[in-house]
Amino acid sequence: MTITGIIAEFNPFHNGHKYLLDQAEGLKIVAMSGNFMQRGEPAIVDKWTRAQMALENGADLVVELPFLVSVQAADFFGQGAVDILDRLGIDSLVFGTEEVRDYQKIADLYTEKGAEMEKFVENLPDSLSYPQKTQAMWKEFAGLDFSGNTPNHVLALAYAKAVAGRNIKLHPIQRQGAGYHSVNKDVDFASATALRQHQKDQDFLERFMPSVALFEQASKVIWEDYFPLLRYQILSNPDLTTIYQVNQEMAVRIKEAIKTAQSVEELVELVTTKRYTKARVRRLLTYILVQARESDLPEGIHVLGFTEKGRQHLKYLKGQVSLVSRIGKEPWDVMTQKADQIYQLGNPSIAEQNFGRVPIRIETN
């Protein structure tokens, strides 16, 4: 049987995600971000709610990406997620993209010329942002051109890099309906961005979201809920360079900007430069919020939920892979668990995220 991997955030889960799961074959394993997202923001609803939405709509097994995989630039996000799915035995990776290219060919190219390609990136001037360097590399070696608004295409290239040299086939699916950041309401498939913006519009949610009741009942948060906490972290920390990935230049800019910024958005605007993109600045602010430090990724894989089919697969994996289904005295990943505790501070009604939580079981799919 085919075992298909899907890397996702489901922030929140919508019809486009359901379409992706419907297109996937065989046993469907989702590696999903926890409570903080790749572009450096808190999830609108918590990881358990999002895992349940996925399981109700076609996923067989949902596992959690640790914090230091979730909140990373595309390449590291892709690498970390593919590592986890590879250990879970996937033979194909399905993903949505704005431009369906021959990603398999691109992966083969990277297998062959990876070292040379990385050297090319290292030699590019530091005035370029990391995404600009990556795009220059793909243009040079694969003749690829980019427009700035194809984040899924950028992630797809990161997945192509991550599967290079592994026995995993890539299956791109043409993204349906609205673009990634589109807030358009007159489409067949709305984007997650639009759903976050129109979260109080009942009709809109019902049109574009399969598990709408789950979403409506869940406690929701936005970045601004954490602004006082973020401000406190910045003001009270004498040396921000002790935080993961924060360099001297960024530390100075952030300390200066917090004197006048009245919101997270304003802070991001003030700190962003040509070299430091908004997404990168948001990630740095997320690291500061949760006081992230460089740390090893966890050995075990945290299971958020499964169907009967997923349970059978877990049984098969037992003994081959370290699986964590309950977090008790022994931590799974200290960094992720700390991030979860801080996530809970954004809304007092968010349920406990780790202790006493067991995987969600869905009997039928």
Swiss-Prot record:
The entry's keywords: ATP-binding, Cytoplasm, Ligase, Nucleotide-binding, RNA-binding, tRNA processing, tRNA-binding
Name this protein carries in UniProt: tRNA(Met) cytidine acetate ligase
Domain of life the protein comes from: Bacteria
Purpose: Catalyzes the formation of N(4)-acetylcytidine (ac(4)C) at the wobble position of elongator tRNA(Met), using acetate and ATP as substrates. First activates an acetate ion to form acetyladenylate (Ac-AMP) and then transfers the acetyl group to tRNA to form ac(4)C34.
GO cellular component, one term: cytoplasm
Residues that, per the record, bind ATP: 7-20, 96, 152, 175
Catalytic activity: cytidine(34) in elongator tRNA(Met) + acetate + ATP = N(4)-acetylcytidine(34) in elongator tRNA(Met) + AMP + diphosphate
SUPFAM superfamilies: Nucleotidylyl transferase (SSF52374)
Cellular compartment(s): Cytoplasm
HAMAP family, per database record: TmcAL
Enzyme class label: ligase
Annotated signal sequence range: none
GO molecular function, one term: ATP binding
Species, as recorded: Streptococcus pneumoniae serotype 19F (strain G54)
